[in-house]
């Protein structure tokens, strides 16, 4: 658990609170939530739709703040995270904790009152999953932390979908499964080129515990397993060819980029270009796949009516 920031820490300004929400990560969370909302059958009042996305963003930001509050000591020992508000001493730990709790609770309450309570319950589960199950229990204990903890980041499209429909059907479950399967190769590619950071602070990431070779093989395995999950919405007839072809091409490219990662070994002075390329593409992949989902939802009917 974190210790308090230095008593001499300056009062945090809004930029520090914003940094607590992990805005770069939140961008992907918000985008997939919007795509889930837009791809869902039916319609939602634009103001309510905006409210639902705002709640998803608040919930993601709140759980991220609680994650940084708990891991401040760990972050201080890692080059990649040492400049965050807590380890750098720009903020008191209690401020970060209280901020995280406040916006997390508010997000669930507003979602339930304004949208529906099923989406609020799923949002609450996502917050607890990330801030408690992943951060406190899984991450410091098992190299499978990313595999099991992947569910935390897989909820947003499901929440967006349920905000519109008010029910859980197969399609939002598949959207959850896509991100769940995408998470291990995405994060393990990162873990390969920041392995020394995790070793230094004692976090049992897969490359640290099981070794580089095992991690590389598992990246390829999960990338291949992602293919049927990504194509499944098309296979069950829930989407058209715009999404289906996009899913095949994008996920095929993802798997192809995993091959050089799986078949090489790090050498002295290695710049880790294949791993960095895969990590970068994995982010682009999720944006493109979910954009194709929305495009399919609105363009397919137009194409069919014009035919």
From Swiss-Prot:
It holds the Pfam family UbiA. The keyword Phosphoprotein does not apply. GO terms for molecular function: protoheme IX farnesyltransferase activity. Its EC number is 2.5.1.141. CDD domains: PT_UbiA_Cox10 (cd13957). GO terms for biological process: heme O biosynthetic process. It is an enzyme of class 2 (transferase). Belongs to the UbiA prenyltransferase family. Protoheme IX farnesyltransferase subfamily. PANTHER family: 4-HYDROXYBENZOATE SOLANESYLTRANSFERASE (PTHR43448:SF7), PROTOHEME IX FARNESYLTRANSFERASE, MITOCHONDRIAL (PTHR43448). This is Protoheme IX farnesyltransferase. It comes from Erythrobacter litoralis (strain HTCC2594).
């Amino acid at each position: 658990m974190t210790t308090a920031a230095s008593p001499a820490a300056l009062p945090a300004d809004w930029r520090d609170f914003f940094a607590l929400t992990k805005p770069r990560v939140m961008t992907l969370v918000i985008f997939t939530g919007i795509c889930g909302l837009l791809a869902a059958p039916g319609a939602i009042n634009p103001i309510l739709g905006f409210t639902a996305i705002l709640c998803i963003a608040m919930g993601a930001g709140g759980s991220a703040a609680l994650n940084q509050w708990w891991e401040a000591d760990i972050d201080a020992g890692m080059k990649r995270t040492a400049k965050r508000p807590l380890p750098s001493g720009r903020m008191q730990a209690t401020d970060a904790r209280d901020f995280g709790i406040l916006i997390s609770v508010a997000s669930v309450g507003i979602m339930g009152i304004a949208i529906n309570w099923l989406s609020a319950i799923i949002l609450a589960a996502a917050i607890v999953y990330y801030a408690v199950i992943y951060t406190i229990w899984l991450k410091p204990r098992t190299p499978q932390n990313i595999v099991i903890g992947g569910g935390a980041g897989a909820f947003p499209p499901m929440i967006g979908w349920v905000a519109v429909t008010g029910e859980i059907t197969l399609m939002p479950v598949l959207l959850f499964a896509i991100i769940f399967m995408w998470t291990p190769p995405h994060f393990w590619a990162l873990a390969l080129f920041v392995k020394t950071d995790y070793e230094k602070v004692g976090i049992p990431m897969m490359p640290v515990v099981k070794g580089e070779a095992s991690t590389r093989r598992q990246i390829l395995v999960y990338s291949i397993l992602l293919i049927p999950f990504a194509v499944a919405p098309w296979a069950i007839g829930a989407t058209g060819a715009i999404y289906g072809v996009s899913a095949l091409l994008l996920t095929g490219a993802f798997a192809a980029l995993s091959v050089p990662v799986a078949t090489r070994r790090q050498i002295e002075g290695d710049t880790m270009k294949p791993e960095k390329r895969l990590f970068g593409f994995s982010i682009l992949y999720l944006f493109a796949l979910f954009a194709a989902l929305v495009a399919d939802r609105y363009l397919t009917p137009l194409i069919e009516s014009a035919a």
